[in-house]
Amino acid sequence: MRVTYLMRCLAMMRGGGETQHLAWIRALAKLGVEIDVITGRPLLGHAVYPPEPDIETTTLRSPYAREFVYRTQSWRGFGRLTMWSLHGDEELFCRLAFNRIAARPQQPDLVLAHALHQAPRLAPGTYPVAVYLPGPPHTRYIPDLQRADALISDGYAAKQLPAMIGRHVDDVLKGVDIDTFTPDGPNERAVQGLEGKKVVICVTRLVPIKNLPMMLKAVALVRQRQPNVVLALIGEGPQKPLLEQQARELGVADAVRFVGYLSQSSTPSWYRSADVFALSSDFDNSPNVVLEAMACGLPVVATDVGGLREYVNPPAHGVLTPKGDADAFAAALLDYLNDEDRARATGRDNRHAAVTRFSWAVSAARMRDVYARVIDEFARKRSAPREVAS
């Protein structure tokens, strides 16, 4: 079985979607599935992230509008412009990707398009196309998605999307590498000068939907009662200058560490340095980072949005607060920072849940079965005799 993944942003940013697909690709390879990736970089400039050495990757030059969208989507009057910019960028990337596939001597058995909703409409029809949906699409894409050979999602989104799109969505839960993400091992406290600090860690892209301004407000409130608090922000994104300015205005610039992007192999030591994991998103389907934090034995404080309850069952695994409520978020953080016994007990429960409920091997086997079914259905559909009109 050979599958080609279309991942528009893999060379330019690394968020939860990109990370989870890389994990799936590696787990599927162990099951004998051959996978290559087509991604894009800007017309001018270079890719931010080089190809993964163990994954066959093709990088196409095309406009890259996502940075523009992130920077301007909250500007008054720019909503329609940003939507059309992103649509045009993704549409062109899909066309270029399908042209590149057509030029290959061997065609894939299946193409998986990550959040590229127009791909089924643009595909040549000589192989099946599945679309992975990390969350609800814009309604304009529903006709395109109804043409897909399969739709795949997980958790909350997989439960909500069938009613919206009007067709079946395969639910393939994510996993976590419990051997890499573990409470045991080196941490960064001594190296980073965090000894004696109360460390809150957030691993995320610095983009508007993550509502990091609310988290900074919460940290400012926490600091009033816990002066040793430090927030470690792991990730990159266009909102970094805005967040740095806000931290200065709130008087917490010295309590916020902008660590930047870290590879998965470098992230566990930071999780082990923390007392609590925090996520302030306005929406998240089922973020990988929550599973990583749980596997590392951390309690979780997050906003009660999307599919967070798929992983976090309060109070056993953490606290979920109302979206945008900095006071409630700060109170939940303080409960763990000021009660080490409670934090450790919750962390133990989270590690147990990660080990017993989530596994990339199980998840990849489920994904392989979905691919095999879609390929078989497509082949039978193409070989079925067609009725001739009289």
Show where each model-derived region lies:
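A conserved mid-protein helix/loop that constitutes part of the nucleotide-sugar donor-binding site
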Residues: T19, A23, K198-Q224, L231-L233, ...
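Carbohydrate-associated surface elements
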Residues: A157, G175
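A short helix/loop element that forms part of the nucleotide-sugar donor recognition site in Leloir-type
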Residues: T182-L194
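Nucleotide-activated donor-binding/catalytic signature segment of Leloir-type glycosyltransferases, i.e.
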Residues: E244-Y261
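Short alpha-helical donor nucleotide-sugar binding micro-motif in glycosyltransferases
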Residues: Y261-L262, S269-A274
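Aromatic "clamp/platform" in nucleotide-sugar-dependent glycosyltransferases that forms part
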Residues: D282
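Short hydrophobic beta-strand element within catalytic cores of glycosyltransferases
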Residues: P299-A302
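Conserved acidic donor-binding segment of nucleotide-sugar-dependent glycosyltransferases
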Residues: P314-P315, V319-A326, D335-E340
